[in-house]
Amino acid sequence: MAVKPITIKEIARMAHVSCATVSRTLNGDPGVSQELRTEIFRLCRQHGYRKNLVARRLSAARSGLIGCILSDMNNPLFAEFALALEEAAHRRGLQVMFCQGQAEAPDFSKKLEFLIGHRVDGVILTSSSRQVPEAIAPYTDRIPIVIQGTLPPEEGGIPAVSLDCAEAGRQAARYLYGLGHRRAVFLGLRENNCAMLQRYQGFQAAAEELGMSVRTLVNPERTSTAAVGYQLGRRFFFDNLTETAVFAGSDNVALGFLAAAREFCVSVPDEISLLGFDNISHAAMHHVRLTTFDPRNRTLAEQSLERLLQCLEPGGGLGEMPLIPPIFVERATCAPPGLREA
């Protein structure tokens, strides 16, 4: 027997407020207190409440325009995803409107309002921030939203297309162990980023099983940049840390670490191995040749768009999708332990 969907009246009853207050909260009314807003969002997530979008879809003709919010346009990873998404949309006769925004930023709601104001049919958000569920909650009854990224495990009801980040972390640990490394660093952890956190957890778990020790150097910023990698790299070498391998949270961080290694006259990979994640175009250049993981941007773009188009159909876009495994790309920055091991 099918379970009857929860209604806005039931959410209002549990929150001890009126239906109008719940509606105003979900629509982002600034007059609702933060305490009440948090409680209503919690109840909606807990009970799977989501307004029926069918009426909106049937009453408004589709524009053929898709919105996409990129977390960081300065990051080549997102630029490459944007290109792949635009190509996928073009093949379907669709256009894409891009803007930049981070779920934890104060102006994030303005980005969604901007896209809605331009009558996009739906939105793809590239983000793995823990703040995503709360940031999009006021809008999920107004427009379909698909997340290209990793969400907290408890948020399984949000349409998402995600990488198998934990398996990538495990694979990284096994690879470095196979080369002979027993002491490693996870460089640039952002604990608010669910994708990176899962990579770290997979790396840490596999390393523990293999008997490897792992040191963690945390990224204090909201984005993963070469500047962060450079500063963490300088700290690593200045403190004379003895780990023989580094798994960087992103290729940008890895490239910054590589610059610091050269400044300290440390050879990669002869003295220390370096493994990245993202396979940005710069990682393949002849003077870098970074060993890394490819997140398969074309596949992510295709599946994100397909999921969004499914969400535009009555009853579509429900259920979880299989995780997409990244592809390991071996180049020239990892080798068996060298001088540092000696």
What are these regions (language model features)?
Residues R119-S127, V185-L187, N219, N240-S250, ...:
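Periplasmic-binding protein-like
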Residues R170-M212, E320-C334:
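An alpha-beta-alpha
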Residues M1-S63:
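N-terminal helix-turn-helix DNA-binding module of bacterial transcription factors
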Residues A89-Q100, Q204-A227:
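Short beta-strand elements in bilobed, periplasmic/extracellular small-molecule ligand-binding domains
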Residues A2-T7, R45-L83, R91-L94, F114-G117:
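N-terminal helix-turn-helix/winged-helix DNA-binding helices
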Residues A160-F186, Q201-A205, A226-F236, A254, ...:
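Hydrophobic alpha-helical segments within soluble ligand-binding/sensing domains
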Residues R215, R234-A342:
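Flexible loop/turn connectors
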Residues A103, L125-R170, M212, N252, ...:
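Flexible loop/hinge segments that line or gate small-molecule binding clefts
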